[in-house]
Amino acid sequence: MSLQSNQLVLHDDVHPYLLNATLFTDYAHKLRTITIPEGHLVTVNSEGSLNFPVGSIISKTFYYPKADSGVLLADDDGNLFKPDAGTRGGLDLTKVRLVETRLLVHRQSGWVALPYVWNNEQTEATLEATGDIKSLELVHGPERRRFPYIVPDQNQCAGCHGTNTASKSINPIGPKVANLNRNGYDDNQNQLDAWQADGWLELKGN
């Protein structure tokens, strides 16, 4: 990801995706992406979970649509990510407020959770291992309310993604075959089929 002319844009090797089932997070919209190291494949195990190679990065950016006045909106109408903007699509920062980006990075030692928080100027995101609390004001219909938006710390991220309490290892929980089996941002093609055609996903044996 990078910032270009008031757009948060994706690089060529960053793949945005949508899920069939998602969690509610204080009306925040989410831009989800997968980055796979060049020359490697994602495979699928017998349970329908994806096996990501070391060096993979899964990101989730939380943002809110905003009115011309700058007020944040509790708006569930569609996704504001535009696939045809920038290199691989983008978010128009004149229309949205970025709050946080959570990364899962696959290292040789396993997955690591890294929470990043965007500054008020929307110019950079800083790693906040201890989490953060943002005071946000949100308009929902005729109502306006201020609330504490909580960015989880690394331990809380690991707690949600923990799959083995003994080893304390963590794993991705959202991107599974069943949850990804739908059209993506290109509404004319199933995203799993698109990824196979692009040569970085192998579904054999599933």
Question: Which sequence ranges carry the predicted segments?
Answer:
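Short, structured beta-strand/loop micro-motifs enriched in basic residues and often containing a Trp
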Residues: 31-43
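Short, conserved secondary-structure segments in the cores of folded domains
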Residues: 46-48, 160
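Sequence context surrounding c-type heme c attachment/ligation sites in exported
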Residues: 73-206
